[in-house]
Amino acid sequence: DRLAHELMEPGKTVYQGIVDAFGMEVLMDTDIDISAPAEGNAVTDNGQSTVNRSIDRKKLGDIVFHDKDKLALLNSISHPLVKEEILRRIEEQKDAGKKLFVIEAALLIQDGYKSICDKMCYVYADLDVRISRLCEYRGFTKERAQAVIDSQESEAFYLEACDYKIDNSGSLENTKKDLKHILDECRI
């Protein structure tokens, strides 16, 4: 998520695609006059300046997590560019002598990462824990948290596709212990 959010910032690769696809209504509200483009700012197809307004992820989420076609559109804009950047960063780190790379993302399997990953691990939590955490840490309502979860593949899909599973319903210490066990097993 961090990399995707980084690439959604004004001037980054994903930003203009999202503005073109979803319009100015997905941008943060501002008191700035946006009637005339300022030098260096992106401009939409209808000639409006984005005035370097950040994408409002809540507004965008309200659109895509209630419409599978719009979610697919967002994913088609962002995911190829995120994957390209991940691969670039991996190569950069390989050149620096690094040997372990961890990619944390919701759609690794769907976006074809299995072909570049030696092992895949599914970290999951009970439904009530997931909803509670989304509400607490991201400020979601229960309805929005459920909509996000409903937009994802089934738990069985991930359990079947991954080499390792970690139950993250409990404490962070237990999750770290399970992860260490996996890393030890992989001799990392």
Where would I find each of the regions flagged by the language model?
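Residue-level signal for inorganic ion chemistry
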Residues: D1, L74, V102, I166, ...
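Anionic group-transfer/hydrolysis microenvironments
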Residues: D1-L3, A106, G112, S169
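Short, acidic/turn-prone active-site loops that include or flank metal/cofactor-
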Residues: R2-A4, D126-D128, L172
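ATP-dependent small-molecule kinase phosphotransfer cores
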Residues: H5-K98
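An amphipathic alpha-helix signature
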Residues: Y15-V19, K83, L127-C135, K142, ...
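Short beta->alpha linker loops
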Residues: I55, I77-S78, A125, I149-E153, ...
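Small-molecule kinase domains that catalyze NTP-dependent phosphoryl transfer to phosphate-bearing small molecules
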Residues: E85-I86, K94, S115, E136, ...
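ATP-dependent NMP and nucleoside kinases share a basic, alpha-helical "lid"
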Residues: L87-D95, K99-Y137
